[in-house]
Amino acid sequence: MSCKKRKSQISFNPRKNKKIKDYFSQVPKEEQNDPNTVKVDSKKMPRDITNTRDQRPLSPRKTRQDQTPPLNKKITVTLGVNSRKHKNMKYELTCRETSSLYAALNTLSAVREEVESQKGREMLVCGKEGIEGYLNLGMPVCCIPEGSHVVITFCQCKSKTQENKQFFESQDQASTNYVRFCIHAVGSKRKKILKCGELQKEGNKLCVYGFKGETIRDTLRKDGRFCTFIESDDWKLINDLDTIIENTQPVDELEGKLFQVAAELPKNPRVVSVTQNSGSENRNFHKLEEYIVNEYTTLKEEGKKLRAYIKEKSEKRKKKASLFKVHKEHFGKMTRNSTPVKVVKHLSRVSDSVGFLWWNNNGNAGCATCFVFKELYILTCQHVIASIVGEGIDSSEWANIISQCVKVTFDYEELLPTGDKFFMVKPWFEISDKHLDYAVLELKENGQEVPAGLYHRIRPVPHSGLIYIIGHPEGEKKSIDCCTVVPQSSRRKKCQENFQAREEAGFCFSTSFIHMYTQRSFQEMLHNSDVVTYDTSFFGGSSGSPVFDSNGSLVAMHAAGITCTYQAGVSNIIEFGSIMESIDDHMKQDKYKEWYNTISGNVQNVEMLSIDF
């Protein structure tokens, strides 16, 4: 290309001449038209300059001579991979506040090398000091406090990194225009809310940023890490359980707060939808932590034996397609849909004593059901308490932990009530049993009236017929489920029929134990007189629900269930609850006798309330 042609191109674009004038020392007038001088500078046009720190002033974004240079910020970075190479050493990073986190990190050669070696995997950046949660890679550095410490790891993720490159560009907004807040990685109803399975763990948090004036939905949608439900209107944010924030609200007031996403689930009482191509993304049942289930290996072993037996028997059957139809018709004839008004009145009265129990133990959040036993004492499942405190915590610390993170309300019948409707729990945990799976907690007085206790309504469990569970399945509003009692003598047959029927419908034999863990093997459950078995649609969040007979008598506490999965969903096999008479007898033992006599002495001389109308 001739010098004459190059000169004509430069004079045709005065904007670029202005940039040279702005950023370099003044060139003498007689040299401005010298083509040799222009030729040297023309090799460094902005589109050809590599993104080095010394050359950034030539960015096309910087066109104003009087623009204030962006401030710098220091961040400490640790590469949490390849420990032999990096030896957990800390890297000091100084970067411009207008840079995105991703762009800033890539100025470190160690990070660039690791990104290159981790091709096909997604970078995760988690705040360790100064900022918490997994950070959005597009977050402007101005949102990160000075001196923060972050840790970089990598994971396999289905979403492609290049789809989010729009978030890695520099930002020119003032730091005061941003809002930063955190989201629990596990939802309150819809558990799977993130695309990346590595992040989908209890206790993990996502650090999200947005612009003031922007809606919550737009902010989470642009974040890029949430599942497609974020595009709909059927979700909201919950703050500390007592505050609901709709996704159409602006993010302005969310600064520094922690929230949980509550997304609505498809309504199907018996079969839980599971998206075939998304793993377990849409499961709405609560599966127990593996470390809890692993404590009781006999249940898994018996489950394998039973599945093998059922599979062997089912292979011998020729008319497999008709079996499921016959089973459904038979079950339908056994169960009535109508409920006598008298029963409804009984259940309406006792339902006031059923409570919604919620906890948030440093990010480990969940919910269950409880009910008033006597005065300020409430009853729930022992495995619920184990889930609250977490793995490896000494039992001597349980009382203090639950007193700090557990809340109870009895008014969740339509919308979650406000804070003054919640009871806290005293730092007291003395009465419980792992075998019967029950635990007693004591509420703190808060000026609100505690509903009547159900202690005086304990009666023997019926051997057949209908029973009624009242609770908060999946953390939803209080509801009632009518169940058919499975007699003890029919438990094995019922389980085999259900396994066979679901196999014919396309189910696979990989059982999952929901609601709870259990120390009882399958064989022990079949012959255990301390439990009542039944069919119910109540899944996660219903542990601790009271079970009543048709007279409104308290007969059991809902505890456990066995399910099987198949290609399109999850179905229950059988559920069971601990019989209240067995729990009551256990409380009378020497270990708890003093406590039991104290609470029961208040009613010894009081005539039992009639449960008949």
Swiss-Prot record:
It is found in: Nucleus; Chromosome; Cytoplasm. One of its GO terms (molecular function) is peptidase activity. It holds the Pfam family Trypsin_2. Residues 1-72 are annotated as: Disordered. Belongs to the FAM111 family. Keywords: Autocatalytic cleavage, Chromosome, Cytoplasm, DNA damage, DNA repair, DNA replication, DNA-binding, Hydrolase, Isopeptide bond, Nucleus, Phosphoprotein, Protease, Ubl conjugation. Interacts (via PIP-box) with PCNA; this interaction is direct. It comes from Mus musculus. The active site is at residues 383, 437, 543. Its EC number is 3.4.21.-. The modification Phosphoserine is found at residue 25. The gene is Fam111a. Single-stranded DNA-binding serine protease that mediates the proteolytic cleavage of covalent DNA-protein cross-links (DPCs) during DNA synthesis, thereby playing a key role in maintaining genomic integrity. DPCs are highly toxic DNA lesions that interfere with essential chromatin transactions, such as replication and transcription, and which are induced by reactive agents, such as UV light or formaldehyde. Gene3D superfamilies: Trypsin-like serine proteases. Residues 40-56 have a biased composition (Basic and acidic residues). This is Serine protease FAM111A. The record marks 331-332 as: Cleavage. The PIP-box mediates the interaction with PCNA. Autocatalytically cleaved; autocatalytic cleavage takes place in trans. One of its GO terms (biological process) is DNA damage response. GO terms for cellular component: chromatin; cytoplasm; nucleus. There is a cross-link at residues 19, 29, 62 (Glycyl lysine isopeptide (Lys-Gly) (interchain with G-Cter in SUMO2)).
